[in-house]
Amino acid sequence: MHSFYLFLWIFFIYSFLGWCLEVCFFALNTGKFVNRGFLNGPVCPIYGFGVVIVVLCLTPLMENTLLLFLGSVLLTSLLELGVGFALEKLFHQRWWDYTNEPFNLGGYICLRFSLIWGVGATLVVKLIHPAIAALVGVVPHTAGVVLAVPVTALFVCDLVITVLGIAHMNQD
């Protein structure tokens, strides 16, 4: 079932899980809790977009792990490069910087994390996503739509508030 409804929930679920991953990774490395997201809420939209793109484009390759992995490396790297570049150009800030990593491209992407994202996306497509999609499918459609409205509204409000706040800071 590839529907807007399903992909909206996939986006929100993986945006939240990505935020959890980022916060935990940072906390383990620094001993500090820091909201690692672009937004104020507990979401990292790049993870949600990444999984939606990978699932849409690479599910047909699910049985060929090598092609799935290579496609995942390529798609997630292109997404991270594009988003990192766009965020810096639009808001004059970097949310990540791989400049000190070997084999980096402008500090936006690097080989180590491209390979990590490739492994992660491969595991998501093969192991995690089928369970998440089944979980979304268990929720009665009407209840899911009713719940999606305030979740989407909160996300959009957070996005607008964040963008306006950054724009205001950049004017100062």
Positions of predicted regions on the chain:
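Aromatic-rich, lipid-facing transmembrane alpha helices and their immediate juxtamembrane interface loops
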Residues: M1-D172
